[in-house]
Amino acid sequence: MENNIQNQCVPYNCLNNPEVEILNEERSTGRLPLDISLSLTRFLLSEFVPGVGVAFGLFDLIWGFITPSDWSLFLLQIEQLIEQRIETLERNRAITTLRGLADSYEIYIEALREWEANPNNAQLREDVRIRFANTDDALITAINNFTLTSFEIPLLSVYVQAANLHLSLLRDAVSFGQGWGLDIATVNNHYNRLINLIHRYTKHCLDTYNQGLENLRGTNTRQWARFNQFRRDLTLTVLDIVALFPNYDVRTYPIQTSSQLTREIYTSSVIEDSPVSANIPNGFNRAEFGVRPPHLMDFMNSLFVTAETVRSQTVWGGHLVSSRNTAGNRINFPSYGVFNPGGAIWIADEDPRPFYRTLSDPVFVRGGFGNPHYVLGLRGVAFQQTGTNHTRTFRNSGTIDSLDEIPPQDNSGAPWNDYSHVLNHVTFVRWPGEISGSDSWRAPMFSWTHRSATPTNTIDPERITQIPLVKAHTLQSGTTVVRGPGFTGGDILRRTSGGPFAYTIVNINGQLPQRYRARIRYASTTNLRIYVTVAGERIFAGQFNKTMDTGDPLTFQSFSYATINTAFTFPMSQSSFTVGADTFSSGNEVYIDRFELIPVTATFEAEYDLERAQKAVNALFTSINQIGIKTDVTDYHIDQVSNLVDCLSDEFCLDEKRELSEKVKHAKRLSDERNLLQDPNFKGINRQLDRGWRGSTDITIQRGDDVFKENYVTLPGTFDECYPTYLYQKIDESKLKPYTRYQLRGYIEDSQDLEIYLIRYNAKHETVNVLGTGSLWPLSVQSPIRKCGEPNRCAPHLEWNPDLDCSCRDGEKCAHHSHHFSLDIDVGCTDLNEDLDVWVIFKIKTQDGHARLGNLEFLEEKPLVGEALARVKRAEKKWRDKREKLELETNIVYKEAKESVDALFVNSQYDQLQADTNIAMIHAADKRVHRIREAYLPELSVIPGVNVDIFEELKGRIFTAFFLYDARNVIKNGDFNNGLSCWNVKGHVDVEEQNNHRSVLVVPEWEAEVSQEVRVCPGRGYILRVTAYKEGYGEGCVTIHEIENNTDELKFSNCVEEEVYPNNTVTCNDYTANQEEYGGAYTSRNRGYDETYGSNSSVPADYASVYEEKSYTDGRRDNPCESNRGYGDYTPLPAGYVTKELEYFPETDKVWIEIGETEGTFIVDSVELLLMEE
């Protein structure tokens, strides 16, 4: 029985346990490295200001007073944790190297002090240059020595100190190099080295840290204690310093910067100070369970603890924690362990002063002779508060001091003022111990955060303020908090679909309005748009590049900055700030580390804008002499750079503005010279027949706005895909070089269903949809238009990155997140006789389609070589082979078509039809004409093809035939092509379009009647000719009569056998078969009885060819609309139709034509009343 067992308290320092001896030594030797590292972190967080102060501070803080024995402690700290000793020779070499670095740095500091006191002294400038170079060389050598194979981990803490010193040294060269007499190219070289070394040093530190941590993973609690101490100590001595490396980028952080470390570190005296490894199944993982998963940052404001008695020992048994987020909202957590509210001891409740220290009294109790297993728990603990050192106690204070594990940031002052960390949360791991053969375990785990992570997000108007996004107060749906990669100073946020990340409240410490710029540090597996809202209003939206590939680990190089170039203000001293991402496909990953707010003054803004404009202008050219512009510099980009220059301040940089303006004008002229398009700025459309742009009449030219600096065009949708909205231009053969690739590119503000074609041997075709941004101007900007009506391109506006590009290739349907497009085409041999040219076409054939585009360019990209050259030669040969085949085919088809057309007329003057020419014969001839292929391009039927001349020649004669036929037929709309226009209707009838594209009159009821009054010449002879079809029983009748008698009629039934035209005979037995062949498919062209007297259609003036097979290459397609154009659409009548005629001699000047039936359905194809020849 437990109450009969004598408990024995075993002090841990009395056990003969070598592991305990090592840990005790760690506490005694590890303090100095922790003290120095925390002091350095404090210095980098608070004293990182422009000037020589950083160099002096590093010398005074570290390199000027640390002795060789102190450096030995840095090495010993990690050696003991990983149980790996550095060989004596390598240890001595490392310490000697560090001492040498300190001596070299001291000499450099002396030279720097002397130069600072007398910066114009040439000798002092030379001295500081020499000593900088010597120290730089020494650091390069030393840091390489600290990466000695097999000893990277124990050397890591001195590696990071040397790396930090090297970055500081290079920062001095970038900041003061020109003052030392270095030329700008050398200074820029040092800057590039600085950036590259930030990447390299960060990678080495993270790789080495992760390897060392992974090596310490184990299975029991003793191994976890060592694992956790390594994680905690190296966070303080390595990772925190690495997280501040980016601040050495003096061009990104030119003024004092406020940073925060949001990561958490853990202490647990029950586990870490235990003299034994607790006998607990899977103890390592159970201990690690006490580490909180990634979460938005919170700050503990209440703690209640209850005791539990385990084997006669009263220990911490459970607790209740509540916290507040950065918005001040309370967060209630589930209770930990066994919590009894009635017996809870109050530790803290709504107290704004956090705890900076714990004094713990762990107990390790073993049962008597009958029970050798331990009870491990916390018998008591005292909590000390910041500011006043006030103490709160659970039962009693102890001797295990958290300051031994997490020292103050400055040992010279009172720890309640100079503390480095505060207690942020308390978790609990518990093992019941009732299982036979195991210990009992009650282990509170204390979570600590660095004091730089403040409970609010306060913006300093004099500093760059970095706000980790993990300090938001509310996550948005779809956002998760993930473990930081180690170099960010805390956890980060992730999204895999578009939307806002989290809501953040910021407090402005200063008077309003203060202007700010913003940067977002992000990583992404896809191109995306990042947007920012302030107080619920979107102030920025910009396109940014991917920074990593899917599946890649998060590294320092994975992160980049999304910069808001437009200054903005906060409307209130406490405002919301939200970062979001969209316009990317779900499943990609987007990470946000932090956002940064940069205060802007008039001088700073002018200098920033000038520097940005200078970089943008210089980046346009291939060299500093500005002979040419880069191939990838688009015309749109030049316009945007011009806007940057135009918006520079006349007050601060007038001369520089004029110089840059001349350069950007030169770049624009060079862009115009290489552009093979005529009128790229859309001065007009259809102005010249064979030059410039041709387009449909619904296209409008718009003047420049906030997106386009120059004119652009708007293409609307169309209600009929056979009559698309189009814009095209021909690139003349004389402008093209043989065996060269050309590129079409431009800028699309927004589009839907915009088709882009490049045509030569074949058609390169893309359909491009670009999501529009709407207005670029945020709601807070009242007037983006100047007083004279021109757009104010200098006003704050929503931006996207003009440098992003999405280049489509043949066959793709691009859903562009970029507004740029590009499409290339290869040109083979050029021949002015063939005059093949290149056609540039933009087309929209849907009702919802639309596009706004400008800055179009067609320019030479590169000569063709290798595979590309072979491919274009193959395409050229294939095109010529098909061209020859087409010529042979065209000769045959043209001959047949011409014979059919000539047969319609009495002579070669084509001014009179043959007496027996009827409408069916004209249609048949027209169909043969339309068998001539390549009269027009299938991609756009207004562009002439190779056979356009002969096609138009015959089409003109077909039109003449129709005209003469219409003049000869005195019945108006006798073919019902215009519905029921000119006909009188009684009852219900309809005009329907059959599946062979012929319009017919359908009389479905016996009481219905259709009639027309026709004026004639008395005494002349006429022929009434009707082509019709009768369904069902009864008869269909077409009657001609005058007022008084003189009546004649044509009757139709499905049981009549007689001669028909053309050569069709019908019997009663044929009715069913004819029905099946015809199919009975009608499409109504009549909109109802009330519209019967209106004209429903007109004959189009443009008849393009019908293609019966694919054109020259597989890339060319038939135009489905060709079958709907002109009289060529008419096909021969289906079987069952008959043509009847009679002679009629009117006695008056008016006759009536009446159509009706007795039963069933009567279908009339055409009614003709032809004047006989004299």
From Swiss-Prot:
Q: Would you kindly state one Gene Ontology biological process term found in this protein's UniProt entry?
A: sporulation resulting in formation of a cellular spore
**GO function term, MF aspect, one:** toxin activity
Q: Which domain of life is it from?
A: Bacteria
Checking CDD domains in the record gives:
delta_endotoxin_C
User: Does the keyword field hold Nuclease?
Assistant: no
Keywords (alphabetical) are: Sporulation, Toxin, Virulence
Identify the InterPro entries for this entry.
Cry1Ac-like_dom-VII, Cry_V, Galactose-bd-like_sf, Pest_crys, Pest_crys_dom-III, Pest_crys_dom_I, Pest_crys_N_sf, Pest_cryst_cen_dom_sf
Q: Does the keyword Plastid apply?
A: no
Q: According to its UniProt entry, what is the function of this protein?
A: Promotes colloidosmotic lysis by binding to the midgut epithelial cells of many lepidopteran larvae.
Q: Any additional notes?
A: Toxic segment of the protein is located in the N-terminus.
Family, similarity comment? Belongs to the delta endotoxin family.
What is this protein's record name? Pesticidal crystal protein Cry1Fa
Q: Specify the species.
A: Bacillus thuringiensis subsp. aizawai
Gene name of the record: cry1Fa
